[in-house]
């Protein structure tokens, strides 16, 4: 029988972070409320001083200081909760990383549990053996039969005879090149007019004078 009742169920980290954030929100609202009260008491004290009501102004300043002290305490709690949230989030992330690494190591261990160096060597050796058998089979299949080799040689000889006959026929059809004389080059000389140009009257007189002197 348990003296203190049932044990509390284990709380999830994310749920804890959520509760801390709610507390932060509550502290922030409380700080805002007290800050507003603080500022009002300070303004009230200034008004009372201007009215020469110093005793009442002193009471307002005391209230302001009380509010200020409370705001300071709340700010300390606020900072502490922020640090806790930061630490929890980092711890949660580290835990998730470790869990992932542990799962990965477990999976590798399970996979390697079915493999050994000897098994790997056996598989590699078997693959090489099968590849050699495949190569031998391929070479055997690709080799021509004996009759096919002889037939091919005979066909090649026949083909060579055809080529020689074709070459001989081409040599017989070749004609000797004919030597042609070069063509006569025609040169066109300018024609000389056979008609005597008509002399002028003065030239006729000079010519007649020359003929008379020659007689």
From Swiss-Prot:
The keyword Protein transport applies. It is a peripheral membrane protein. It is found in: Cytoplasmic vesicle membrane; Late endosome membrane. One of its GO terms (cellular component) is phagolysosome. GO terms for biological process: endosome to lysosome transport; late endosome to vacuole transport; late endosome to vacuole transport via multivesicular body sorting pathway; lysosome organization; protein transport; regulation of receptor recycling; vesicle budding from membrane. Its main location: membrane. It holds the Pfam family Snf7. Residues 10-173 form a coiled coil. The keyword Protein transport applies. Keywords: Coiled coil, Cytoplasmic vesicle, Endosome, Membrane, Protein transport, Transport. Probable core component of the endosomal sorting required for transport complex III (ESCRT-III) which is involved in multivesicular bodies (MVBs) formation and sorting of endosomal cargo proteins into MVBs. MVBs contain intraluminal vesicles (ILVs) that are generated by invagination and scission from the limiting membrane of the endosome and mostly are delivered to lysosomes enabling degradation of membrane proteins. Belongs to the SNF7 family. Probable core component of the endosomal sorting required for transport complex III (ESCRT-III). ESCRT-III components are thought to multimerize to form a flat lattice on the perimeter membrane of the endosome. This is Charged multivesicular body protein 4. The lineage of its organism: Eukaryota, Amoebozoa, Evosea, Eumycetozoa, Dictyostelia.
